[in-house]
C-alpha cells in the first residue's frame, strides 16, 4: 500500500514549485511544451479522421464524440503550463514517450533533475500497479 508523502517529500515539492526559470529556460520550455502538444493534437486529428471515415451507423458518431471528449479531458489534465508544475508535466510526457529529454536540452540541471525524478516516480507507481492521476 502506498503511503502519503512525508515531510521531506513535501519540502521537495515546495522547492520544485519555487524553481526560478530564466528567460532562456522559459523559451526552451515553451518550445518543448508546444512541440509535445502539437504532436498530441496531430495524433487526435489523425485518429478522429480515421474514425470519421469509418462511420456507418449512429453509434459510430457517438464513439467519435466520446473519443474526442475523452481526448480533450486527457489533454486538459496533462498539458498545464504553470511553472509551478511544469517539471511534473515534462516528467510525465517523458515517461509516456511524448517528449524526449533531448528536447529539453538547455534547461538548468535543477529542472532536469526534477523532471527525471518525477518520471522515475511515475515508473515506480506503475510497477506497483498504481495509476498516477492526470492521464
Place the predicted regions along the sequence by residue.
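Acidic, Ser/Pro/Thr-rich low-complexity regulatory regions
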Residues: 2-135
Amino acid at each position: 500500500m502506498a503511503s502519503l508523502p512525508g515531510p521531506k517529500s513535501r519540502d521537495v515539492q515546495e522547492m520544485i514549485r519555487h524553481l526560478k526559470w530564466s528567460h532562456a529556460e522559459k523559451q526552451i520550455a515553451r518550445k518543448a511544451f508546444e512541440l509535445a502538444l502539437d504532436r498530441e493534437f496531430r495524433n487526435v486529428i489523425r485518429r478522429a479522421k480515421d474514425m470519421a471515415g469509418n462511420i456507418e451507423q449512429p453509434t459510430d458518431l457517438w464513439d467519435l464524440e466520446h473519443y474526442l471528449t475523452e481526448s480533450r479531458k486527457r489533454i486538459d489534465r496533462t498539458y498545464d503550463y504553470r511553472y509551478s508544475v511544469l517539471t511534473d508535466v515534462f516528467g510525465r510526457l517523458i515517461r509516456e514517450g511524448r517528449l524526449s529529454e533531448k528536447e529539453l536540452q538547455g534547461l538548468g540541471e535543477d529542472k532536469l533533475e526534477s523532471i527525471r525524478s518525477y518520471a522515475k516516480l511515475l515508473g515506480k507507481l506503475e510497477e506497483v500497479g498504481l495509476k498516477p492521476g492526470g492521464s
